[in-house]
Amino acid sequence: MNQFIDIHPKVLDALRSGKPVVALESTIIAHGMPYPKNVETALNVEKIVEQNGAIPATIAIIDGRIKVGLNPNELTSLGKLSNVLKVSKRDIPYCVIKKYSGATTVSATILIADMVGIKVFATGGIGGVHKDAAATFDISRDLEEISEKQVAVVSAGAKAILDLDLTLEYLETKGVEVIGYKTSEFPAFFSNASGLNTTFQLDEASQIAQLMYTKWNMGLSGGIVVANPIPQNYAIDKDSLDKAISSAILSAKDNKITGKELTPYLLKMLHSNKDITSLESNIGLIYNNAKIAALIAVEFSKL
């Protein structure tokens, strides 16, 4: 294995024996939620993956070592620290040589999962094309990594703060299938009403696993996006959500928040908005994605 990577013994055993494994990102722990809710949520996500038959592998960088699978102490430490870097692909070598701790974004998690052979990854929502990207060129690295690596990404669509239409256009250009799990409408993270179509709809985890297997055994490159709608009891009314997002974006512009700081800032603004329950919704959709990802990983391990 890569000299810079430490794989948790349980994860390593699963990979060597062909057992199902689900990769999990760590940005949500360090930058997505306040402590202690972040640690509690991350531990519950791992539990949900296990309860549905797969081995969880939370990915992060701890003191310059890339970790695939965290122990509870490492996970708690990551949730408590205030100086944890937000690590995308370009930041990994810097974080390693400086022996820093870093929380991996969707793109970095996909990259590391692919390095060690994990084929399924659960997250809240993927990054994508930001609003006003025509002027700012702010497009998440997540989309490139999804298009290049053979990993299935289970998410509640793309984060609601993004331009969802352009995000889907970008994925289409890159040849990435967007599979709606039991839906033909692309979910909008906190809401299921985007008015946009997925590439295909599949209703069974086994069908998604078969599509992954077929695509990659045909020699086709790249991953797939499994768009899994937020459970209805956690969904936020679209009009209320749109107002909250507009307010958050305006605040970001006023405070000149850009680049890698933008998404955490916008999500923080949504979580603090008293008119919506975005933190509870975020947790609900992540739990749901972890369950579906585990079911897909189990089915894929049978092929």
Swiss-Prot record:
Which molecular function terms from Gene Ontology are attached? hydrolase activity, acting on glycosyl bonds; metal ion binding; pseudouridylate synthase activity
Instruction: Note whether Hydrolase occurs among the keywords.
Output: yes
List cellular component terms (GO): cytoplasm
The record's annotation in InterPro entries points to:
Indigdn_synthA-like (IPR022830), PsuG (IPR007342)
What EC number(s) are associated with this protein in UniProt?
A: 4.2.1.70
Catalytic activity from the UniProt record:
D-ribose 5-phosphate + uracil = psi-UMP + H2O
Enzyme class (EC, first level): lyase
Pfam families in UniProt: Indigoidine_A
State which residue ranges cross the membrane: none
Locate the residues binding Mn(2+): 138
List cofactor names only.
Mn(2+)
Biological role:
Catalyzes the reversible cleavage of pseudouridine 5'-phosphate (PsiMP) to ribose 5-phosphate and uracil. Functions biologically in the cleavage direction, as part of a pseudouridine degradation pathway.
UniProt protein name? Pseudouridine-5'-phosphate glycosidase
Q: Origin organism of this chain? A: Acholeplasma laidlawii (strain PG-8A)
What is this protein's gene name? psuG
